Amino acid sequence: MGDNKSNGDSGKLLYCSFCGKSQHEVRKLIAGPSVYVCDECVELCNDIIREEIKEISPKQDQDKLPTPRELRAHLDDYVIGQDKAKKVLSVAVYNHYKRLKNAGPKDGVELGKSNILLIGPTGSGKTLLAETLARFLNVPFTMADATTLTEAGYVGEDVENIIQKLLQKCDYDVEKAQRGIVYIDEIDKISRKSDNPSITRDVSGEGVQQALLKLIEGTVAAVPPQGGRKHPQQEFLQVDTSKILFVCGGAFSGLEKVIEQRSHTGTGIGFGAEVKGEDDKASISDILMQVEPEDLVKYGLIPEFIGRLPVLATLAELDDAALIQILSEPKNAITKQFAALFDMEGVELEFREDALKAIALKAQTRKTGARGLRSIVEGILLDIMYDLPSTENVAKVVIDESVVKGESTPILIYENSESQAAGAE
């Protein structure tokens, strides 16, 4: 290899065998047996190969569509519990990508979209389920918050911005974006304020539902290209949203009361009323499992919007046992992540069983579900993570129940096998 000349050719002017440029016109000239190639031609070849790989990859992805069992098995590695929701999601996602693989009407039958509605409390795993599937399928994934969306022409975020975000995730590759997954969170927050159609404009509730209808069902959205505002003369990108899988999720607080009103067999008041004791009351999770589309209409979603989300999955509230599992069992469990961080310092991190129970209890008290676990663990480990890089000869850090409760500091075990509480000196 040489910059401007090759070994054995010191007095001879060399040229690129591909483009014909001399060694003085290029930065690098790579020598082979009686052949030379310049850095510009190498870069050009790389670009051509990249473009060809980009064209081939969607087809390869389609050929390797995992079965519902394989999708479910992958979800089990990262998400604890929620067995029914996993099964529903796996089948819906499989059917969606099978529809894309076999595009066009099948024997005159046009297959509809299998968009999904996830109902479950905060921190039950709605976002994680969608994100994990997208990562496994190697498709672009983006999230949107329904509470920030408004109808076009009003202050706020237009629904078309969701597609713009998806394009950004795949470097504005339209073909890739059209195979992506969009998760819209807090969908329950855009329910209309009453059952009856209002004469006033509801730009953040029913208005957003109307705006999302076409996008979710399938339309060709015109999205400005990268840096579109700086280059207004560029043509808009046309994205077919009928190929994009939309997953909507929400806590739907109070929905259980709507379901109970529908399913109640008692008269409710008077001498003939059916009175139920505390022991007869079903849990909120059990009640939500009985949800029907009519309940969602009563809650405030318009019938047309519910019709665009035919797949319904309910997630149960996580109990203490599930939270303890989430802390330690998944492949990317929080305790494993922090153990890896400590390992980078050459220190072993151990969470005792009573510590995991205490962390789960804290999360239940805060009513944050699995979402709050990380912030709790961060708080517990903050001081030791601050001091550890400056402390020598620490071999192991142990976290027990008293550390979680703030009654003591983490136990440090040194390389000479002596142990003491952090900061005890």
From Swiss-Prot:
Domain ClpX-type ZB stretches: 4-57
GO cellular component, one term: HslUV protease complex
Binding site for ATP: 121-128
Keyword Glycoprotein: no
Domain of life: Bacteria
Oxidoreductase in keyword set: no
GO BP: cell division; proteolysis involved in protein catabolic process
Transmembrane regions listed in the UniProt entry: none
GO molecular function annotation: ATP binding; ATP hydrolysis activity; ATP-dependent protein folding chaperone; protein dimerization activity; unfolded protein binding; zinc ion binding
Keywords: ATP-binding, Chaperone, Metal-binding, Nucleotide-binding, Zinc
Gene3D superfamilies given in the database record: 1.10.8.60, ClpX chaperone, C4-type zinc finger domain (6.20.220.10), P-loop containing nucleotide triphosphate hydrolases (3.40.50.300)
Positions bound to Zn(2+): 16, 19, 38, 41
NCBIfam families associated with the record: clpX (TIGR00382), PRK05342.1 (NF003745)
Quaternary data: Component of the ClpX-ClpP complex. Forms a hexameric ring that, in the presence of ATP, binds to fourteen ClpP subunits assembled into a disk-like structure with a central cavity, resembling the structure of eukaryotic proteasomes.
Similarity remark: Belongs to the ClpX chaperone family.
Main function: ATP-dependent specificity component of the Clp protease. It directs the protease to specific substrates. Can perform chaperone functions in the absence of ClpP.
Protein name: ATP-dependent Clp protease ATP-binding subunit ClpX
Taxonomic source organism: Shewanella sediminis (strain HAW-EB3)
Organism taxonomic ancestry: Bacteria, Pseudomonadati, Pseudomonadota, Gammaproteobacteria, Alteromonadales
